[in-house]
Amino acid sequence: MKQDIYINIKAFDCSLLEECVRKFIDELKRSSAKLSGPIALPRKDSKFIVNRSPHVDKKSREQFEMRTSRRLIVLHDLTPTMMQMLTGLSFSAGVEVDLKVKEVKEVKV
């Protein structure tokens, strides 16, 4: 069975995200890995509305927005050296990296 790694990268700052993705792809190309991506996933927008004053004036409100940008990289044919390299990478604060390993069954026709 083959194993694929799905790498989800999330960040609030788009420039930080692109720098992290570039770093990932450069490291993976050095190890001659087969990969798909980076695939741009939809941006998540969260809006928060709060009252400006603590007691009165319900009409006076403030709006805040939080945007989360995401990218997906799929690594095919995982090797132990690739896994060590992936876990050894360090990224700047504000970037969240999730690794998921899935087994792919080969179908013979």
UniProtKB/Swiss-Prot annotation:
Q: What is the originating organism of this protein?
A: Wolbachia pipientis wMel
- The cysteines covalently paired via disulfide bonds are none
Gene Ontology CC, one term:
ribosome
Subunit info here reads:
Part of the 30S ribosomal subunit.
Q: Which InterPro entries match?
A: Ribosomal_uS10, Ribosomal_uS10_dom, Ribosomal_uS10_dom_sf
* Pfam families attached to this UniProt entry: Ribosomal_S10
Family statement drawn from the similarity comment of this UniProt entry: Belongs to the universal ribosomal protein uS10 family.
GO function term, MF aspect, one: tRNA binding
Q: Output this protein's name.
A: Small ribosomal subunit protein uS10
Lineage of the species this protein comes from: Bacteria, Pseudomonadati, Pseudomonadota, Alphaproteobacteria, Rickettsiales
Q: What does this protein do?
A: Involved in the binding of tRNA to the ribosomes.
Give the UniProt record's GO annotations in the biological process aspect: translation
Sorted alphabetically, the keyword list is: Ribonucleoprotein, Ribosomal protein
